[in-house]
């Protein structure tokens, strides 16, 4: 799911570039087609190769524009709570997709349409379902955090990657 985060965050980053946008779109197409297959059948060599391809392409998609909100939120989750990086990034991806859906003069909805979704809200629903289908937790309640852990997350909530997100958080 981290591959999908890399691609989407590179696309909607304030520093997005046309070539990176095209790479992000290509990587997302592969992820939506093959991630669930790899999860359900890890021995599927074609699907694994395609996900490796998507990983490289998504890496290129965010290299110039940088990652944004989902990665910013993931770092304290991983550092303090030891949640695996990809799951921590994916935890907020569909939420930020919804927050960002109407920003950037419609380009976010157009991106989702290029992937076959009605709009970014529809794509956010698909991301949520994909996370569920591959066994990832989908909200912080599922981590049974203590009050102290929540306070720690709030205390270190501002990561520089948030400044790459097109909406002030």
Where are these regions (language model features)?
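Alpha-helix C-capping/helix-to-loop hinge sites
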Residues: 7-15, 38, 58-61, 80, ...
